[in-house]
Amino acid sequence: MTTILPNLPTGQKVGIAFSGGLDTSAALLWMRQKGAVPYAYTANLGQPDEPDYDEIPRRAMQYGAEAARLVDCRAQLVAEGIAALQAGAFHISTAGLTYFNTTPIGRAVTGTMLVAAMKEDGVNIWGDGSTFKGNDIERFYRYGLLTNPDLKIYKPWLDQTFIDELGGRAEMSEYMRQAGFDYKMSAEKAYSTDSNMLGATHEAKDLELLSAGIRIVQPIMGVAFWQDSVQIKAEEVTVRFEEGQPVALNGVEYADPVELLLEANRIGGRHGLGMSDQIENRIIEAKSRGIYEAPGLALLFIAYERLVTGIHNEDTIEQYRENGRKLGRLLYQGRWFDPQAIMLRETAQRWVARAITGEVTLELRRGNDYSLLNTESANLTYAPERLSMEKVENAPFTPADRIGQLTMRNLDIVDTREKLFTYVKTGLLAPSAGSALPQIKDGKK
């Protein structure tokens, strides 16, 4: 049995994730006038471009909501963001610049907390503003049904009647005006922006063209560091972790992780840290392009990774990164609370993050230009005296020890030469004078 309703369920309670923007405002009013009983739910995610959250539910009531609730999701959002950081759950990167999955994390929190609030009100039909081409329609679908197995989905943007009557922003604005609401469309930007306190996503419209770059974006969490007119002074910042949790910035301890992240955003944002331009594969395997901001998470992640590399051994780091990529993809797909994701996340939190205690000092400059100045931790396994080029007392190994270790390597070197010779005999390899490959013709060098 399908859980998606193609037409408006008149006479029934319908919950809508209400942002207060034109789309959801027109949809709420339209649903009320067509005979549904709309309930509005707004997630407070600490969006940097939202000036007044308390006003949003009031507007929803004006547009016909039976009830309107503001759900504070900030603490849970930051908790999930730090969990993703601890596990390195980021699979999209370009030349070392990372997308911190800030929108997928936000959807995991919104999709569960709003549906839980609806369930408390006896609302078992949910609508939101996601379109059929994007990732969010599937993310919200999964999280909604995980939270409420009796949930039905109604999306105005999948209802042909709604599309025929209010198919565009101009039509929506006129509809609101005729209903007596002086709702003026905001000025059209050259791209679309979605944000929460973890980060911002800029995409669509002009940004669908790869010839349009970061220079057309006006950052909402930082500064346009690519503009020479923007003055940015170098700044030193110290980040402290205790058992994987960020607890202090520049010596100031924060009992509330939300306040710590806000300060990290302010520090990183002054430099434009954490902005990246990514081409990615959506859930449906079509490629899309986005420009992202995440100044606070970027700052914390740099410090966290520095401590990871100084504390853990190579095999642990390799496993952490492999699992992090897998977990990042699951998060992106809307599977953050699936069993395989929980297994990967909790493994990293237990065996990687719990050892991460220490301080890292950085110098931030413009954009993603920074230097690591100092790393301190009681758990460091980095010990410079082990490999010092100077003469040291009680050296951990001697020249004779290294001779023995190198001699043992003869076994795999001989094996490698024999395999290369086999490849030459079968024609897979053809060494030439200009090749860096050893000149193996008869099994001898």
Curated annotation (Swiss-Prot):
Q: What is its EC number?
A: 6.3.4.5
**GO annotation, cellular component aspect:** cytoplasm
Protein keywords: Amino-acid biosynthesis, Arginine biosynthesis, ATP-binding, Cytoplasm, Ligase, Nucleotide-binding
Q: Where does ATP bind?
A: 17-25, 43, 129, 131, 136, 194
An example Gene Ontology biological process: L-arginine biosynthetic process
Location of this chain's protein in the cell = Cytoplasm
Q: List the disulfide bonds.
A: none
UniProt-recorded Gene Ontology molecular function terms: argininosuccinate synthase activity; ATP binding; protein homodimerization activity
Catalytic activity field: L-citrulline + L-aspartate + ATP = 2-(N(omega)-L-arginino)succinate + AMP + diphosphate + H(+)
Q: Which InterPro entries match?
A: Arg_succ_synth_type2_subfam, Arginosuc_syn_C, Arginosuc_syn_N, Arginosuc_synth, Arginosuc_synth_CS, Arginosuc_synth_type_1_subfam, AS_cat/multimer_dom_body, AS_multimer_C_tail
Describe its assembly: Homotetramer.
Which HAMAP family did the record assign?
Arg_succ_synth_type2
Protein name from the UniProt record: Argininosuccinate synthase
